Amino acid sequence: RQEAETPEPSEPTVMEAYKKTTEVNPLNPYRFCADPTSVEYEGRLYVYGTNDQQEFDATGGLTSNTYGKIRSLVMMSTEDLVNWTYHGTIDMTTVCGQWLNASWAPSIVSREEADGKTHFYLYFSNSGGGVGVITSTSPLGPWTDPLGKNLISGSTPGLGLCSTPFDPGVVIDNDGSG
């Protein structure tokens, strides 16, 4: 009996322009979504992640990814963890402007504020040089930049030896403080 040879993986075809079929995201097969975070709102789970789309160029060729040019976050949601809706990306350059270097590893929380509305706070690593935050009263935006700068930077008191804060993890305590 002769064993069949396993063919070598090939470069993506035009139909696989953004990702190889062996490199799929189970939630969204044509989009990378690293470092996911999620929040539940009105029976729907909203997931946000680092948008690694530039790992392949427009023709499907591999490119070098230094992560320094990631300036958008991916959004998707589900009601049943089976069927997913892709909501596009948050263009962080448009929201944050000139102070943004890159946006990685988001972390989201929501809470009802004094105005009676649920507010969403989406924190992100700004290229390892700090942690920024954008806000919205909807899990899908529009998003605004309330500070115009990093919330936490390497010079923030109390960081000790952590001169490059990144990959935030945000929680809200039972008393409502965060």
Give names to the regions the model predicted.
Residues E3-G178:
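Carbohydrate-active catalytic/glycan-binding domains of CAZyme proteins
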